[in-house]
Structures are given as structure tokens and as C-alpha cells.
Amino acid sequence: MFIKTIKMKIKEVMITPEKFAQVNPNEFLKEALDKMTDSKLGIVCIVEDNLLKGVITDGDIRRKLLEVQKPFSAFFIDYAIDHVITNPITCKENDSLKSAIKLMEKKQIWDLPVLDDNGILVGLLHLHAAIKHFI
């Protein structure tokens, strides 16, 4: 079991696109937050033509609220793209699960968007889903 786990690829354990939050750049932030909440993950991917434009995490929203100090309700009518992290840390679907977990630990993140060789968003690796294969 442990030997198999060491050799596992991200694509074997990633969350498929229909199970995590995605919005287009022109959707309102409220819609992005609603989808993030519905997915029960702390991330929403901003996607246009299947290409990842960026991500928004619940932590990004908290930090932005403290930084800007405008009423929370005012954020609801902002566009999602206005709050996006445009160069998110990503991984490839054929990367090893072990290397992805190490990257998540190093960068202190819970979620990694998964791209194919053409840069198309094909999944999301969530830390809990990843580490359960090692315990």
C-alpha cells in the first residue's frame, strides 16, 4: 500500500472540475463566494475558456476586507476578477502526489489547481484528499 502511495499521480486523487467552485472573470464576487461555500472548499478558480486566470481563497477575502476596510456588502458587487490572485501555485496532473504535498507544505496552502500539459484546468488537489493516502 505505501509503495503504491509513493508512486501515485495527482490525477488519481484530484477533485474533478464539476465538484469544485469555478466562475468566469465577469461574475460578481458574491456569486464566487456562494459557489465556494457550496463546494465546501476555501477556494474558487477563475476560469475563462478552460484556462485558469487565477484563484480566490477565503483567506484572500479576509485579508482584503482588513486591508481595504470597506463594508463587506460593497464587495458583493465587485467582479471576481478584481480580487483574483493571478499567478496561483499550480501542479500538473501527472506530477507525483508526494511532490504536490511537499509543495503545499512549503507554500502553506490547502488547495492546488491541477493543469494538463496545455494549461487547461482539469482538477483541484485538496490537502485532506491528498494526505489520506499516506495515513
Model-identified regions with their sequence ranges:
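The conserved cystathionine-beta-synthase
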Residues: 22-40, 47, 90-108, 114-117, ...
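Acidic (E/D-rich), amphipathic helical modules within compact regulatory domains
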Residues: 31-67
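Tandem CBS (Bateman) regulatory domains
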Residues: 1-19, 53, 57-92, 96-106, ...
